[in-house]
């Protein structure tokens, strides 16, 4: 089987969708494809309905000059599952849609990778893990800084960083983005 070894980035669209206007542009140029998962009835993991203004979808079309963005609609709310189980399920289905054999990067709407080009260049050093992902599942982590408050002249942030799981070669998620596989 020939693997594509592409950079596929996935986002989950929900009630905080407007934040995607900040998180999509930094990854657009380096991503081979961008997938945006949204419940087909616009429901959260807890089953609450939300609305998305048409102007947001217009904005997506405007910025998608290279036709990289795909909206993936599916039933992501199962009433017999709790919110974290629905979260995990949506991430898994999104990753399957993104295609095993590619780097599967999932970024939450309130997360930004300031040097996405550097992240991708580092990620490509591990492309050999895409040759047989089921036998060699890994997750790629980065560090994230929690922004406390935006100010007119900057921002306040929490000094201590923590690890965040951003990419995988094989999406066997157990809890949100966590698969409990080897982390690099």
Spans of model-derived segments:
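Short, solvent-exposed loop/turn segments at secondary-structure junctions
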Residues: 14-16, 41-42, 76-79, 110-112, ...
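Catalytic-site signature of metal-activated, phosphate-bearing donor transferases
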Residues: 81-92, 112-184
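Active-site-proximal specificity loops/subdomain of glycosyltransferases
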Residues: 39-103
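Short, conserved active-site loop motifs that form the nucleotide-linked donor/cofactor pocket
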Residues: 7, 67-70, 137
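N-proximal low-complexity "stem/linker" segments adjacent to membrane-targeting elements
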Residues: 1-29, 36
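Short beta-strand-to-loop acidic/aromatic patch adjacent to the donor-nucleotide binding site
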Residues: 101-114
């Amino acid at each position: 089987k020939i693997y594509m070894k592409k950079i596929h980035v996935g986002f989950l669209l929900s009630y905080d969708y407007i934040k995607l206007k900040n998180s999509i542009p930094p990854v657009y140029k380096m991503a081979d494809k961008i997938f945006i998962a949204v419940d087909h009835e616009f429901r959260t993991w807890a089953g609450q309905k939300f609305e998305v203004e048409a102007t947001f979808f217009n904005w997506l079309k405007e910025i998608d000059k290279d036709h990289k963005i795909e909206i993936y609609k599916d039933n992501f709310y199962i009433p017999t599952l709790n919110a974290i189980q629905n979260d995990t399920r949506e991430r898994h289905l999104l990753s399957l849609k993104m295609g095993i054999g590619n780097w599967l990067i999932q970024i939450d709407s309130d997360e930004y990778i300031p040097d996405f080009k550097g992240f991708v260049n580092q990620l490509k050093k591990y492309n050999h893990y895409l040759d047989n992902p089921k036998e060699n599942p890994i997750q790629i982590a980065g560090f994230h800084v929690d922004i406390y408050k935006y100010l007119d002249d900057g921002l306040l942030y929490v000094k201590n960083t923590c690890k965040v799981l951003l990419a995988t070669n094989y999406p066997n998620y157990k809890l949100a983005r966590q698969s409990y596989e080897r982390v690099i």
